[in-house]
Design a protein with these regions (language model features):
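Conserved acetyl-CoA-binding loop-helix of GNAT-fold acetyltransferases
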Residues: 81, 87-103, 109-112
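Conserved acyl-donor/pantetheine-binding loop and adjacent beta-alpha core of acyl/acetyltransferases
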Residues: 39-78, 96, 116-143, 149, ...
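Active-site rim helix/loop that mediates acceptor-substrate recognition in acyltransferases
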Residues: 2-48, 53, 57-65
Length: 182
């Protein structure tokens, strides 16, 4: 679903494994009997993940062997909404579910690596930190980061090479976090 062709396509086996190891962490959005979006998650032990990691590391190269039911972080590994159904607040509803799940499971926070897909437009002028600050100040619109900031997430760290093929983000991602305050 990304314009740069870096779509992540999930195999039936991967989805089945995620459902088997953590069914409540996998959700779909259905409109008129059609799946139009999904959110996939695992639980990780933050002490093992740390601030600097890649998508491949946190997902065990998409084997999900990093899932730890006794961990303390709900880690989002994917969210997508079919382009024809964007703007209907469906992603926001999935994030509300994740927040409720985090609270129910008494986890410390929700975290994930968030792309900054409009950064390529500014990369020759400003560094990622400045870009993030300008998005926070609403001087720059970034479809991913703007949404996450409006959904109570904060940037914990800028990570390099999180998604090595993400040219739009210039190989950067924001480690985003929403704390469970309950």
């Amino acid at each position: 679903v990304y314009s740069d062709g870096s779509d992540v396509f999930w195999t039936r086996e991967q989805i089945q494994k995620l459902i088997k190891i953590f069914p409540e962490g996998q959700i779909v959005t259905v409109v008129d009997d059609k799946i139009v979006g999904c959110a996939l998650s695992i639980i990780v032990d933050y002490d093992k993940v740390k601030n600097d990691h890649t998508y491949a590391q946190v997902t065990g190269k998409e084997t999900f062997n990093t899932h730890n039911p006794k961990g303390n972080i709900l880690y989002g590994i994917e969210v997508f909404i079919h382009p024809g159904y964007r703007g209907l607040r469906l992603a926001r509803r999935m994030y509300e579910y994740r927040k409720e799940l985090c609270e129910t499971l008494n986890l410390k926070a929700i975290m994930f690596g968030g792309r900054i897909p409009n950064y390529y437009k500014y990369a020759d002028q400003i560094r990622p930190k400045e870009y993030i600050d300008k998005v926070k100040q609403k001087e720059i619109f970034d479809p991913v980061l703007t949404f996450q900031l409006s959904n109570d997430f904060h940037v914990r760290k800028v990570m390099r090479n999180y998604l090595p093929n993400d040219e739009e983000s210039k190989h950067y991602a924001c480690l985003l976090q929403c704390d469970n305050i309950y």
